[in-house]
């Protein structure tokens, strides 16, 4: 499954070196109008090449052998090739090698904790949805 939010502004919100987790977050549309919070969380991050801010975001698992080979050569990756995820935005391309990323969308206060901060956090917000990028 592909994750695509081309009309949102995403930022690298947090990276934990000790837990090797990456959190991307969007609170606004590209127009800077407020919208529901969207978060993408990836664990077991081995490699990341990405911009700190992304104008629109599509994430998909790299699946074709030719594309895996081309990206592995381009970024100098030799391990965990089955866990490459391509990040595409209007201002460039990025790549992570990680566990399967998850996403969540919820209407919540801007100062609320991450939707991935603890089990059941997303359930606090009516209408919230979650998924995985496989």
State what each model feature region is:
Residues 1-134:
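Surface-exposed, interaction-prone regions used to assemble/regulate multi-protein complexes
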């Amino acid at each position: 499954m592909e994750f695509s939010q081309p009309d949102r502004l995403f930022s690298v919100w947090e990276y934990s070196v000790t837990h090797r987790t990456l959190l991307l977050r969007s609170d606004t549309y590209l127009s800077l109008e407020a919208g529901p919070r969207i978060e993408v969380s990836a664990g077991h991050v081995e490699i990341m090449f990405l911009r700190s801010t992304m104008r629109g975001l599509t994430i998909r698992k790299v699946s074709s052998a030719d594309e895996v080979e081309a990206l592995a050569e381009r970024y100098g990756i030799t391990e965990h090739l089955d866990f490459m995820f391509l990040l595409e935005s209007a201002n460039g391309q990025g790549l992570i090698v990680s566990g399967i990323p998850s996403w969540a969308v919820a209407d919540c206060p801007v100062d609320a904790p991450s939707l991935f901060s603890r089990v059941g956090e997303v359930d606090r917000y009516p209408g919230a949805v979650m998924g995985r990028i496989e």
